[in-house]
Amino acid sequence: MLLCQKPTYRLLRYSVKRYVASLYSLRGVSTRVNLIHRTYATTVAKDNIDHNDSSPVFNNNEVRFENINASIHPILLDLKNKLIKGKFDSPYTILNDQPSDVKTEIFQSFEQQLSKALSSKSTPENKITLVDYLNPTLDNISSLLHLISNNTYPNNFLEFSNLSSNNDLIMQLFTQLLHKIFLQYRIENASFEKPKVDFSNPAEWFPEARKMKRKIIMHVGPTNSGKTYNSLIKLSKSKTGYYAGPLRLLAREIYEKFNSQGIGCNLITGEEVVPSIDKYGKVSGIASGTIEMIPLHKKMDLCVIDEIQMIADPLRGSVWTNAVLGVLAHEIHLCGEESAVPFIQKMVEITGDELEIKKFNRLGKLTVEKSNTSLQQLKKGDCLVVFSKKKILKFKCDIERNTRLKVGVIYGALPPEIRSQEASKFNNGEYDVLVASDAIGMGLNLKINRIVFSGVNKFNGSTVEKLSVSQVKQIAGRAGRFSAQHGSKEGFVTALHRSSLVYIDQCLKTPVSEISKACIWPTSNIWRQYMANDPHKSSLSSVYENFLTNVLKFQSDNFFISELDQKVQLLNLVAKNRLLSTMIIDDQLTISETPINFRTSVNPKLLKNTVIKFYETIVKRDCKSILDFDFLDLELLSQNSFVGTDVMVPLQKVDKLEDMHRLVLLFLWLSQRFPTLFIDKDSAMEVKALVEKRINQELVNVERANSFFSDRSNGYEPRR
């Protein structure tokens, strides 16, 4: 047995002291700890062993324990009788209460494992320490038995262990090993509870929030009523708080606004975390971020949850529901449409929170024009609302080719940073007209004089349907935005078609229907508990699919189950791939939230292949930078801005660059969740900025090509 050098020796003595304390405290004789510690040190000193020497503490006579099985046989018989009769003392009394068949099974397992351990290579005797006597394992039991047979174990160890003989010491070691084998048996044979998730009352998913008496203040009213402004004023005066918005763009807008006013505010989105640190190195207690990133585990003074009507959205609504039910804020400000009030009132009755409702009226008049308009009649300050990217770009080309108006575009697939730039150019007059999707309905302060609907039908992902009353009001309300500098401003609404204008007028006169049910889906923590009770260890995709089959019968007056097509599609990539199918459940839960949609891509195969490579990196636990993946088209990124007359060339490049941008954002999203695997985030941010720059250049090229065509058609000199 080797004695460690001084530093390690001190650490060993401290570790042994702590371990012995825990061991003896179970037996009620913790007062012996200091005594065994002092005596062990005295024994070492008395043996005149130099602590800097690596010589053995005990003499090893190198006498083999030839008949070890015969020697321990009587002890094994005594141990078996003790187990059968239930004669074990604390802390092993749990063995006494086991059924006879369990006792027989664990003792047989113990004998088999002991026999195997004695016949296999054991821990070298000169590596055995005092800790091994206190906490034996099958790996070192052979060496321990040999040392005991030669009386080369620590002096006075029997006395301090309340033992009278070597056989008693061996019995103690065997008892500890038997107990360990029993615990392993218990884990392996534990009966699983039937996995279930209770959807009847999702408020109980958040027990910490139920311990609090929270105050909920609703700020409700139409678009352009100042409802969010008032709650942000309250947030800016709080010590700790969070603004939860529906879009990354909106979160950044609040972040920049607060910091420009000297109010420290962090930015927290799925792709990046930007802390605000004061001159003393203290991180701000206020943050602005997306609703998905709201910290449900963290107590705070105030939380602002924007666009509360999204609680009924079948795709993302569960995030709002979980936020309202689970956020640990003393004061919660919910901003949005009045349609959400009745449901929140019902929810508060369940949670026991206090509720206050503040109603706001629109700041400025909104007028529906009597007649429809045309592309040729568009004027400066107009925003043409279109419901597909392809049509948005087509309308941009048509307007620029047939008028002398400069046109900006905003749509969902466009990177948020480019959307913000396009909005700024429209607001400061660089663009005359904006062609945009319903993405303008949330966030983006735009100086729009008139909203022009191209139509009232929208593809919802599976079918084409008419815009809801709520959607029409949300979009139309963007006209005539109020500003603190210029006050209220009248807004106007019209459409390209007479039938659309009639429908819009009806919607604006119709009260918004009340939200009757909220979307729900369990949090990752709840799914971890569910999967822990799954005896089949199924893949997460099959669990979701089986789960959905069972919950089709789910009926509730207050809630409905979230749509899972996108989650299941992502998880099927994992389940159908031999390597990815070995991914642990924790990682599967994380990647099920991957923010990517293959259907909106011009090259879904590229997206899928790259996503699979990202997931393989997670399974293999590789470290990779963004340049280690092959989705970047370096030739396209390095091209100089080219001005031509064929508008399709830059449009096709925009499509490719947007797909590239999606994958860069996904890399950044994964780097936030797997920072040791997806590395060199700085390079990824530089690539992101480069892709955004190239998208902006190609949009300018579209404008130039259209201008060239327009000027030639109308007999003007081409604009430069």
Curated annotation (Swiss-Prot):
Ranges where the Helicase C-terminal domain occurs: 359-523
SUPFAM superfamilies in the record: P-loop containing nucleoside triphosphate hydrolases
Transit peptide: 1-40
Sequence positions that bind ATP: G221, P222, T223, N224, S225, G226, K227, T228
Gene Ontology cellular component terms for the protein in this record: mitochondrial degradosome; mitochondrial matrix
Domain of life assignment: Eukaryota
Major location category of this protein: mitochondrion
Catalytic activity, reaction form: ATP + H2O = ADP + phosphate + H(+)
Keyword vocabulary terms for this entry: ATP-binding, Helicase, Hydrolase, Mitochondrion, Nucleotide-binding, Transit peptide, Virulence
Claim: Hydrolase is one of the keywords in the record: yes
Domain Helicase ATP-binding: 208-349
Its job: Required for intron-independent turnover and processing of mitochondrial RNA. It is a key control element in nuclear-mitochondrial interactions. Required for embedded hyphal growth, for wild-type respiratory growth, and biofilm development. Required for chlamydospore formation, distinctive morphological feature of the fungal pathogen C.albicans that can be induced to form in oxygen-limited environments and has been reported in clinical specimens. Plays am important role in virulence.
Pfam families: DEXQc_Suv3, Helicase_C, SUV3_C
GO molecular function: ATP binding; ATP hydrolysis activity; exoribonuclease II activity; RNA helicase activity
EC number: 3.6.4.13
Gene ablation phenotype (knockout): Leads to completely attenuated virulence in a mouse keratitis model.
Name of the protein described by the UniProt record: ATP-dependent RNA helicase SUV3, mitochondrial
Annotated compartments: Mitochondrion matrix
Gene Ontology annotations of biological process type: aerobic respiration; cell growth mode switching, budding to filamentous; cellular response to pH; chlamydospore formation; filamentous growth; filamentous growth of a population of unicellular organisms; filamentous growth of a population of unicellular organisms in response to biotic stimulus; filamentous growth of a population of unicellular organisms in response to pH
InterPro entries documented for this protein: DEXQc_SUV3, Helicase_C-like, P-loop_NTPase, RNA-DNA_Helicase, SUV3_C, Suv3_DEXQc
CDD domains in the cross-refs: DEXQc_Suv3, SF2_C_suv3
